[in-house]
């Protein structure tokens, strides 16, 4: 989950108009690269702009920066409190048990950040060895940033890893501090098939989005262009004609006047749904987002401050709220989707209050104060509590028993209630 400081600066939902920006600190290298592309082919989509700014192999924000923590541009929930990761670890084991206790369990995290979440989950796995028994557990991390993969390796293995060339499906491997095999991949497609619990914690919000605006001539795409009055600036423009994206990505029943669509998120969710349907398992997606109600959420962050999205590309984090209604549509009928449910509700359903009482009773006053502060950050509706959402994708067999058995005999999905099932 992105930095708590973001929560105090919500962006207004307005229609896009032509706009420009400048900065003395603009990343001239990537700006020159973007300008060359625009001159050659015309204005580019917001999705292409985000892709270049964030994941360009040489100049991208995620490729060359350590953007996490107090010195970076955002802080995540696992870094705020270990309780968060512990409860997600309990959720993973609960779903593994409910699905029949497969003899092998792959824990797959998309965009693992510093590795804090996986680290907390592995601690829970170690504490509950008696429950997991002889289950063959392996850890699989999907990470595009070389810098972050090194940070994750240090956190999870003590940096005892080996790197590989492109002839391998994984580019790094090792053994965790708890003795489990761990692998790093560039793409989810490279992760081995098998029963898996997928975690995507603040992953989907950074994927490239297309932006669309309803006009008197129909839907048009918002594009990024060079400001003709100042070649050192970028600006937003609205396409005069339909684009392939505006012709294919807008839902027929769309009623909003401005829409953001993350086609890449749809593709990834379809892959997750296919794997879960065929191999078993579950996915838990955690992000700030909405259920098809918001319009303009595209924004940038740099040094824990709101930052113009067109200024200094490659030097700032770019993000947009996740549209969970779109993820649900892309998952299709082959799986069951639960949520979104607020972080506050999910963590309370998972027993965070009981866990807090145990920790508060066994620590000194200074640690208790820190625990209370962390709890407030995670649960308070004005902070992370209502802003962030939990969404799950499950194998249809997980809840199929409802048709043949009384509800009291069916193991509920931890963290979710019946009202959240769609």
Curated annotation (Swiss-Prot):
Gene Ontology BP terms: chordate embryonic development; mitochondrial respiratory chain complex I assembly; peptidyl-arginine methylation, to symmetrical-dimethyl arginine
UniProt xrefs under Gene3D superfamilies: 3.40.50.12710
Q: GO CC terms on record?
A: mitochondrion
> What are the record keywords, sorted?
Methyltransferase, Mitochondrion, Transferase, Transit peptide
Which phenotype arises from disrupting this gene? Impaired NADH:ubiquinone oxidoreductase complex (complex I) assembly.
The chain's disulfide connectivity reads: none
Record bears the keyword Methyltransferase: yes
Keyword Methyltransferase appears in the UniProt entry: yes
**What is this enzyme's class at the first EC digit?**
transferase
Record's subcellular location: Mitochondrion
From the UniProt record, which GO molecular function terms apply? protein-arginine omega-N symmetric methyltransferase activity
Principal localization reads mitochondrion
Where's the transit peptide in this chain?
1-28
Q: Name one Pfam family in it.
A: Methyltransf_28
| Bilayer-spanning residue ranges | none
Q: What EC designation does it have?
A: 2.1.1.320
Reactions catalysed, as given in the entry: L-arginyl-[protein] + 2 S-adenosyl-L-methionine = N(omega),N(omega)'-dimethyl-L-arginyl-[protein] + 2 S-adenosyl-L-homocysteine + 2 H(+)
> What is the annotated role of this protein in its UniProt record?
Arginine methyltransferase involved in the assembly or stability of mitochondrial NADH:ubiquinone oxidoreductase complex (complex I). Acts by mediating symmetric dimethylation of 'Arg-118' of ndufs2 after it assembles into the complex I, stabilizing the early intermediate complex.
User: Which family, according to UniProt?
Assistant: Belongs to the NDUFAF7 family.
State what protein this is by name: Protein arginine methyltransferase NDUFAF7, mitochondrial
């Amino acid at each position: 989950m992105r930095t708590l400081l973001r929560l105090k600066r919500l962006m207004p939902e307005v229609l896009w108009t032509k706009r420009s920006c400048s900065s003395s600190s603009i990343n001239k290298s990537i700006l020159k690269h973007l300008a060359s592309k625009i001159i050659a082919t015309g204005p580019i989509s917001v999705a292409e702009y985000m892709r270049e700014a964030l994941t360009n192999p040489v100049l991208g924000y995620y490729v060359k920066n350590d953007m996490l923590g107090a010195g970076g541009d955002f802080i995540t929930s696992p870094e705020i409190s270990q309780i968060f990761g512990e409860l997600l670890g309990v959720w993973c084991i609960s779903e593994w048990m409910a699905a029949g206790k497969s003899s092998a369990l792959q824990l797959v995290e998309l965009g693992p950040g510093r590795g804090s979440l996986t680290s907390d989950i592995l601690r829970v796995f170690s504490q509950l060895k008696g429950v997991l028994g002889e289950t063959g557990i392996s850890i699989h991390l999907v990470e595009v940033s070389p810098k972050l993969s090194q940070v994750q390796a240090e956190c999870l293995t003590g940096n005892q890893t080996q790197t590989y060339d492109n002839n391998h499906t994984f580019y790094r491997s090792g053994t965790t501090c708890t003795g489990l095999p761990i692998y790093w991949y560039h793409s989810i497609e490279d992760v081995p098939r098998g029963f898996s619990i997928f975690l995507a914690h603040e992953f989907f919000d950074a994927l490239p989005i297309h932006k669309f605006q309803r006009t008197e001539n129909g839907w048009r795409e918002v594009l990024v262009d060079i400001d003709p009055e100042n070649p050192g600036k970028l600006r937003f423009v609205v396409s005069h004609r339909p684009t392939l994206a505006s012709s294919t990505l807008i839902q027929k029943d769309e009623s909003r006047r401005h829409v953001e669509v993350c086609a890449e998120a749809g593709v990834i969710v379809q892959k997750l749904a296919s794997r879960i349907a065929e191999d078993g398992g579950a996915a838990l997606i955690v992000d700030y987002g909405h259920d098809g109600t918001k319009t303009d959420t595209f924004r940038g962050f740099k040094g824990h401050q709101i930052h113009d999205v067109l200024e200094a590309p490659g030097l700032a984090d770019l993000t947009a709220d996740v549209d969970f209604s779109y993820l649900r549509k892309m998952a299709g009928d082959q799986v069951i989707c639960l949520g979104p449910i607020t972080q506050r509700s999910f963590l309370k359903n998972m027993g965070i209050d009981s866990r807090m009482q145990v920790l508060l009773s066994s620590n000194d006053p200074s640690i208790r104060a820190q625990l209370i502060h962390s709890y407030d950050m995670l649960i308070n509706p004005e902070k992370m509590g209502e802003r962030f959402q939990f969404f799950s994708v499950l194998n249809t067999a997980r809840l199929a028993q409802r048709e043949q058995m009384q509800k009291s005999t069916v193991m509920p999905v931890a963290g979710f209630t019946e009202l959240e099932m769609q």
